[in-house]
C-alpha cells in the first residue's frame, strides 16, 4: 500500500511542481496588478478591443460594431479565441486578461509535459522542458493558438492509441474554440489531413485521425461562418486587403531569420536549441546501432521534427522572397493576402519537443555523469535565455526598476481616469453622450479611446471595408502626399486606419514626456465632420489648428497621467 502511494506521489509530484513554477511566473502580475507591463503591439492596441467588443455584443445579434470606424462589420474584429470572449463577458477587461494569461500558461505547461510523458520521456526532463515552454513570451491574446498546440497533439496521439476517447475529443474541441482559424487553424486542419493520408496508406489510425479532423473542422466553421461566407461566397463588402501590396525579402535572409531568430508571434529562443539538437542527431546517427530501441525511436522522431522545422523555414522563406511576392501581388485575392506562411507558429512545439527528445537520448545513452553534465549545461543555457526573454522578467524589472524599463503599463496605456475626465467635460459642455459623436486620435492609439467608451472613426483592423479605407484616406491625403513612408504604410498595407503626420508618421505611442508638437499638420476636417467626428484627441499641440477649423477646447493632464491630451473640437 505504501509502495503504491509512493508511486502515485512520484507520478503526480513533478506535475504539481510544474504548476507551482508556472504560478510563480504569474505572481508579478498579481503583485503589480494594473501596473504590470504587457507588450502593446497586437495586444493592447488591437486584440483586447476585439474581445471587449465581442463580449459587449455577444448576445445582441449585431452584425456591426458601432463603436469603431463609424460602424464596422463583425468580420473586421474577429477574436482569435472564442472561449476568451466569455472571460470578457463575465469579468472587467483587466481581470479577464489576467485570467486568460494564466489559463494559457497552464495549458502550455500541461500540454508539453503530458505530450513528452506520452512519448516516454523521463519526468525530470519533461518537467524542465515544459516549464521553459510555458515561460516563453506567448501573446496570450491569441489564446491557445501557439501555447496549446502540445495539448492538441497529445490528445490526437492518445486518440490514435485507443485511450479514453471522450477526454481526447474534449481537448481537441477546447483547442479549436480557443484558437484562430486564420492564424493557425488552417495549418492544424492541413496537418490532420496529411496525417490521415499517411495513416490510410499504412492502414493505421484512419478512423481516429479523420474523426479529429472533422471535429476540428466543425468547431472552426461554427466560429467563423460569417468570415468564410465573405471570403468564399462573396458576402459583404470588398476588404481593404484587396489593395495590400506585399513586400518581399531575399530568400536567404528570410530563411536565416526564421531558422535562427524565429518570430515574436511564435517565440522559441531557438538559437540556443540548434547546437544540442544537431549534436544529438549527428552522434545519434553515427552510433545508431548502439542505441536502445527507445532511443532509436526518439532519434527518428527528433529527425522528423528537425525536418519539419527545415521544411517550414523553406516554405516561409519561399512565400516571402521577392520573386514569389511579385507573383502573389499579380495574382491578387486570397493568394496575395492570406498568410499561409504562418505555419511557423508550430515552431515552439517542434523545437521544444525536439529538445525533450534530445535530452532523453543524452540521458539514456551517455554515462550517468556525462549525461548529467551535458543535460545541466543545455538546460542552463536554454533556461537563462528563456527567462531573460520572458514576460516574467519584464514584470520583475517593472517591480524593482520601472524607471529603466521604458514600457507602459496597462494603467498608463488606458489612462482611465484621464479619459473619464474628457468624457465628462464633453458631456457637460454639449449634453451629448459618447454614442452621439465620434472622435479620432492623433499620436495616441485609437484603442485607448475605444476601451474608455468613446466611439471612433479610426482603429486597427486587418479586414475592414475597402470603401471605408478610401473615405478615411481623404482625411490624411495631404500628410500621405508629403511622406513616401506614410503612403507605403497606409496605401500598401492599411491595417492601422489612423491619423498620421509627415513629421511623426503613424507613430502613436506618445506620452506627455515626449513633448510632441505638430508644426505643419494638414488634415481634411470636412471629411471628418462628414463622419460625425466632433473631436480630435491629440498627443501634442497642433500649431495649424485654426487653418483646419479646429478649436482647442482644453488640455487634459494629471500629475500621474501618462498622456497629455489636447482636445480639439472640429468647427
Q: Can you annotate each of these PLM segments?
A:
Residues 273-310, 354, 358-360:
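Hydrophobic, aromatic-rich transmembrane alpha-helices
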Residues 1-29, 296-297:
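Start-transfer (signal-anchor) and selected internal transmembrane alpha helices
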Residues 105-201, 212-229:
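Membrane-embedded helix bundles of polyisoprenyl
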Residues 21-108, 135, 140-144, 471:
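Membrane-interface coil-to-helix junctions
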Residues 136-143, 298, 310-353:
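Membrane-helix boundary/interfacial segments in multi-pass membrane proteins
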Amino acid at each position: 500500500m505504501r509502495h503504491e502511494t509512493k508511486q502515485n506521489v512520484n507520478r503526480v509530484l513533478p506535475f504539481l511542481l510544474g504548476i507551482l513554477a508556472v504560478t510563480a511566473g504569474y505572481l508579478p502580475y498579481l503583485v503589480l496588478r494594473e501596473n504590470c507591463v504587457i507588450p502593446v503591439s497586437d495586444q493592447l492596441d488591437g486584440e483586447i478591443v476585439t474581445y471587449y467588443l465581442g463580449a459587449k455584443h455577444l448576445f445582441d445579434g449585431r452584425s456591426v460594431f458601432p463603436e469603431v470606424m463609424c460602424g464596422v462589420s463583425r468580420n473586421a474584429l474577429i477574436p482569435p479565441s472564442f472561449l476568451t470572449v466569455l472571460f470578457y463577458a463575465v469579468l472587467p477587461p483587466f481581470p479577464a486578461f489576467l485570467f486568460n494569461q494564466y489559463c494559457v500558461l497552464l495549458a502550455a505547461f500541461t500540454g508539453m509535459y503530458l505530450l513528452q510523458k506520452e512519448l516516454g520521456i523521463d519526468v525530470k526532463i519533461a518537467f524542465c522542458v515544459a516549464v521553459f515552454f510555458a515561460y516563453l513570451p506567448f501573446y496570450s491574446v491569441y489564446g491557445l493558438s501557439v501555447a496549446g498546440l502540445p495539448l492538441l497533439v497529445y490528445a490526437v496521439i492518445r486518440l490514435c492509441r485507443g485511450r479514453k476517447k471522450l477526454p481526447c475529443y474534449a481537448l481537441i474541441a477546447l483547442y479549436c474554440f480557443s484558437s484562430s482559424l486564420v492564424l493557425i487553424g488552417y495549418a492544424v486542419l492541413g496537418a490532420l489531413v496529411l496525417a490521415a493520408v499517411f495513416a490510410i496508406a499504412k492502414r493505421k489510425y484512419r478512423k481516429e485521425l479523420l474523426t479529429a479532423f472533422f471535429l476540428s473542422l466543425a468547431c472552426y466553421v461554427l466560429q467563423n461562418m460569417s468570415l468564410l461566407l465573405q471570403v468564399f461566397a462573396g458576402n459583404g463588402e470588398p476588404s481593404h486587403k484587396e489593395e495590400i501590396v506585399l513586400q518581399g525579402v531575399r530568400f536567404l535572409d528570410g530563411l536565416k531569420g526564421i531558422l535562427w531568430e524565429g518570430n515574436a508571434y511564435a517565440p522559441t529562443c531557438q538559437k540556443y536549441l540548434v547546437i544540442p539538437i544537431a549534436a544529438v542527431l549527428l552522434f545519434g546517427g553515427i552510433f545508431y546501432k548502439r542505441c536502445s530501441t527507445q532511443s532509436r525511436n526518439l532519434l527518428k522522431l527528433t529527425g522528423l521534427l528537425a525536418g519539419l522545422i527545415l521544411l517550414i523555414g523553406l516554405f516561409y522563406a519561399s512565400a516571402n522572397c521577392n520573386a514569389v511576392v511579385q507573383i502573389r501581388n499579380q495574382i491578387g485575392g486570397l493568394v496575395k493576402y492570406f498568410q499561409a506562411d504562418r505555419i511557423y507558429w508550430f515552431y515552439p512545439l517542434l523545437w521544444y519537443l525536439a529538445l525533450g527528445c534530445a535530452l532523453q537520448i543524452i540521458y539514456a545513452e551517455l554515462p550517468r555523469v556525462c549525461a548529467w553534465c551535458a543535460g545541466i549545461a543545455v538546460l542552463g543555457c536554454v533556461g537563462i535565455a528563456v527567462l531573460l526573454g520572458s514576460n516574467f522578467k519584464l514584470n520583475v524589472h517593472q517591480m524593482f526598476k520601472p524607471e529603466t524599463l521604458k514600457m507602459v503599463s496597462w494603467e498608463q496605456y488606458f489612462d482611465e481616469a484621464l479619459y473619464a475626465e474628457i468624457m465628462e467635460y464633453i458631456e457637460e459642455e454639449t449634453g451629448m453622450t459618447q454614442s452621439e459623436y465620434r472622435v479620432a486620435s492623433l499620436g495616441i492609439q485609437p484603442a485607448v479611446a475605444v476601451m474608455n467608451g468613446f466611439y471612433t472613426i479610426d482603429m486597427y483592423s486587418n479586414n475592414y471595408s475597402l470603401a471605408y479605407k478610401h473615405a478615411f484616406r481623404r482625411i490624411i491625403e495631404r500628410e500621405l502626399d508629403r511622406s513616401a513612408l506614410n503612403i507605403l504604410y497606409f496605401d500598401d498595407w492599411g491595417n492601422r486606419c489612423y491619423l498620421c503626420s509627415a513629421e511623426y508618421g503613424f507613430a502613436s505611442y506618445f506620452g506627455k514626456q515626449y513633448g510632441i508638437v505638430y508644426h505643419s499638420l494638414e488634415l481634411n476636417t470636412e471629411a471628418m465632420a462628414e463622419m460625425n467626428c466632433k473631436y480630435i484627441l491629440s498627443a501634442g499641440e497642433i500649431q495649424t489648428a485654426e487653418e483646419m477649423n479646429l478649436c482647442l477646447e482644453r488640455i487634459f493632464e494629471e500629475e500621474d497621467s501618462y498622456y497629455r491630451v489636447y482636445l480639439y473640437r472640429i468647427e
